[in-house]
Amino acid sequence: MSGHLHIGIVVGEASGDILGAALMTELRRHFPNAEFSGIGGPRMLELGFHSYFPQDRLAVMGLIEPLKRLPELLRIRKFLREHFTANPPSVFIGIDSPDFTIPLEGALKEKGIKTVHYVSPSVWAWRQKRIINIARSVDLMLTLLPFEARFYEEHGVPVEFVGHHLADAIPDNVDKTAARQLLGLPGQGRIVALLPGSRSSEVERMAELFFRTAVFCIEQDPSLHFVVPAANSDRYRQLHIELNDFVDFPIHLVNGHSQDAMAAADVLLVASGTVTLEALLLKKPMVVAYKMAPLTYRILSWLVKTPFVSLPNLLAQKMLVPELLQDKATPEALSAAVMNYFENPEQSMAVSQTFADMHRELKCNASARAADAIARLIKPAEAS
């Protein structure tokens, strides 16, 4: 399968650039002379990808910024639709950014171009009617999580679970001692990692709550130490200011090193998000907390169809780790949940073992598996 062919790819986020670059590498196993074009990030460009626009032009967040940028985003999508219609690729792959890529996939599929979407939107959780448009728009959905694939199968959408790239990247066993040495933490004793979020608004809402929780934990066990990894330099400065109210307290603030901080800890207190998957893959017992604006929470409570918010619980389909949201997220309740792991080591070990089983399920060499599925779609007979 060394024939020359053209593969179109559009990614809208930095995480998509990582996936796209790994996918390009694996697709070249099947198609060594393939050409790739569309919109990609720096990692993809290093591999010879031709990007018609800078990838960061699609990187919009929230509700307001996409509206402000809507005319530009529509112009970019129109160009891509017309370009790929005039120069049909053997397959078009949209990675993440579903509000931008799925309508483009639908328009190209109408022209007879095979389409793939890599990384499912959270259609299983909210706005489930999107499945109708997704079914019309894609020839194949590639999911990172097994329960997502089951959802698409139930709705008759061609799908393949390929595994999660983080499960491939994070080792089965992490060295707690080495992580503690790297961060200058005590080699012995109990350590709790506090991860209040990566965005300014999250840190503003969650940091003080997490630090007050640490105070309650210290009252129960004065030997505890805490480590707080800041997502970047801006969050480091923000957290440093928040810590001014907690002087003479055993909290170690570090810039970056979030995985090292989690690896060094015995228990984690985390804001809900992707970090819960990283914590799972590091086999760390965790307590999940989150707060948002009351109106936003009421709207999401009405829209979201799942009983859980954290990936460990979604994967387990049960309350495997504590989730404390909104008014339930108090320092008293969070500290009780954290200390419960220390007071019940058998429970901690059981959670860690379940996480190890989940890691094995998610570790599938995702990029290779995705490339194999795409190759079968392009050339069913030759790729089988």
From Swiss-Prot:
It is an enzyme of class 2 (transferase). One of its GO terms (molecular function) is phospholipid binding. One of its GO terms (cellular component) is membrane. Its EC number is 2.4.1.182. The keyword Ribosomal protein does not apply. One of its GO terms (biological process) is lipid A biosynthetic process. Belongs to the LpxB family. Condensation of UDP-2,3-diacylglucosamine and 2,3-diacylglucosamine-1-phosphate to form lipid A disaccharide, a precursor of lipid A, a phosphorylated glycolipid that anchors the lipopolysaccharide to the outer membrane of the cell. This is Lipid-A-disaccharide synthase.
